[in-house]
């Protein structure tokens, strides 16, 4: 179970995850998958569509491959009978109506238990354009969706996956936190942003994978904790 605590200034600490919990087991599989994702992704992506290149691949292509390889990873660990990975539909009627209008608001992927209970929500975003703030907010903005409870409303923990297509992890860490800082100083924002929204210093998992953490206040629900996995696709160009 996730446990949420606060320090004496009211800033939430990142929640601990019990070592042998279901969520911990799922996160281990997700991380194992992402460690080998860049090479495996390109191999299967080109087999599926030989018109794809590093310049025309989009977010949906990456998320489709991630869903496929996560399913294979759960099977490799003999867990495919316990968990399923699938794209998600809009999480409520309001989102469904937005989808009909062409506004994509559903979470990208979810890991569910055998009884259908959602264990983990995963939102995938490209990090490819220093002027594209969709990782933080916008028409399909990532972090803001969690803060507004459009994504993962019933969860206390979720993941974002950033597909880095240019620049370095350090560049994007600085850029994303800059975008968040700008939201903190924006007058009239419909959702509240503060220092807890800032991403922690990236922790290296491999040459091609880092992880950051953040905590986000929400409209009504308790704060949600996010682990941000950034996977480098730069060397595939």
Regions found by a protein language model. Give the residues of each.
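Active-site metal-binding core of divalent-cation-utilizing nuclease and nuclease-like domains
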Residues: 82-117
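Well-ordered, non-membrane alpha-helical segments in soluble/globular domains
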Residues: 35, 61-67, 138-145
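Active-site-adjacent loop/helix micro-motif of nuclease/hydrolase catalytic cores
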Residues: 120, 129-141
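C-terminal tail/extension regions appended to the core domain(s) of diverse proteins
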Residues: 1-56, 70-76, 133-136, 149-157, ...
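Conserved beta-strand segments of the P-loop GTPase G domain that flank and frequently precede/overlap
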Residues: 123, 160-164
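Conserved catalytic cores of phosphodiester-cleaving nucleases, focusing on short active-site segments
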Residues: 109-111, 120-128, 146
């Amino acid at each position: 179970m996730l446990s949420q605590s606060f320090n004496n200034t009211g800033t939430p600490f990142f929640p601990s995850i019990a070592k042998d919990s279901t969520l911990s087991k799922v996160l281990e599989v997700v991380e194992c998958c992402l460690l080998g994702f860049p090479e495996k992704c390109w191999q299967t992506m080109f087999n599926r569509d030989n018109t794809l290149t590093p310049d025309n691949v989009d977010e949906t292509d990456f998320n489709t491959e991630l869903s496929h390889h996560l399913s294979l990873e759960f099977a490799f660990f003999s867990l495919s009978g316990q968990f399923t990975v699938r794209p998600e539909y809009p999480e409520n009627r309001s989102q469904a109506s937005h989808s009909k209008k062409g506004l994509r608001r559903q979470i990208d992927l979810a890991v569910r238990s055998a009884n259908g209970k959602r264990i983990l929500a995963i939102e995938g975003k490209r990090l490819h354009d220093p002027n594209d703030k969709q990782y933080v907010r916008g028409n399909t903005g990532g972090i803001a969706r969690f803060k507004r409870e459009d994504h993962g409303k019933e969860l206390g923990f979720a993941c974002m996956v950033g597909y880095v297509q240019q620049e370095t992890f350090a560049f994007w860490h600085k850029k994303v936190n800059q975008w968040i800082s700008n939201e903190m100083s924006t007058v009239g924002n419909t959702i509240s942003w503060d220092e807890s929204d800032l991403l922690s210093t990236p922790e290296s998992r491999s040459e091609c994978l880092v992880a950051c953490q953040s905590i986000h206040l929400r409209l009504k629900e308790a704060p949600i904790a996010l682990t941000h996995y950034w996977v480098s696709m730069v060397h595939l160009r």
